[in-house]
């Protein structure tokens, strides 16, 4: 009887731990200040991340809403796609699997369709899933597909699997596109990944980022990077009650066991997609420190499938 009560208390404890709310947070209306009508609107950014999964011959609900917003946007605007542009595993070679290629093409086309009435400029950056099909080769297939579809070389950054690239939006705004998967991935698996890049090691990457931030400290500097530096989602070690019951997000619950799996994930840092990972932590600490060289740095990221 004692042991039964003991296990019951453990189960209740795990359930209470999982009872956090991860709904979208809104600022109370009373705290919103008035924006001066004399302020000049320099540029508008429309952000979407992890948009690389849509039904065949259709768009996801998020992309439909995104397209509607872009249709009303003016010329001085940018649509920024924050990586993971193709689920589940990047752009395959058409010769290897026709079905996989058609699904990947569908997922990209659904995003490109959002730009049909858009008067501004689109920018795509890569995420970790975009590296999951032959690494650099799959990434370059995606890059070339987007460039060809949009008839422009100025739409996918950084190019050629390189880590960082600066894009001048206007005289007062600069965007720095960073491929965080370049930093996090196992380089031994991609021996040719830096052949087309001026930057060939991680330390030089940080030096270049520091230089760009300092040179543009008088301009609003947007760092577009797929992996977030801060997160209250699963990649940051925060799990909803649903994920405590089934870490994979499936239908069948695994109480206690599911929470144990999440605990191991949170404390081990085994996955370099999670903030607790040693290399991810290294990237985060250095990047956050460098961002403080300017008071005008804004971080924008995807990765987590939430608004935060």
Per-range role (PLM):
Residues 81-82, 86, 216-234:
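Short acidic, glycine-rich surface-loop motifs adjacent to enzyme active sites
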Residues 69-74, 215-218, 294:
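Glycine-rich phosphate-binding loop signature in dinucleotide/nucleotide-binding domains
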Residues 22-33, 90-221, 234-274, 278, ...:
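Extended active-site neighborhood of metal-dependent phosphoesterases/phosphodiesterases
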Residues 10-17:
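Bacterial N-terminal signal peptides
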Residues 45-47, 79-81, 124, 223, ...:
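Residue-level marker for buried hydrophobic side chains located in beta-strands
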Residues 1-6:
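Positively charged n-region of N-terminal signal peptides that target proteins for export
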Residues 50, 83-84, 127-128, 178, ...:
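Active-site glycine-centered loops adjacent to acidic/histidine catalytic or metal-binding residues
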Residues 19-102:
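N-terminal active-site segment of His-dependent metallophosphoesterases
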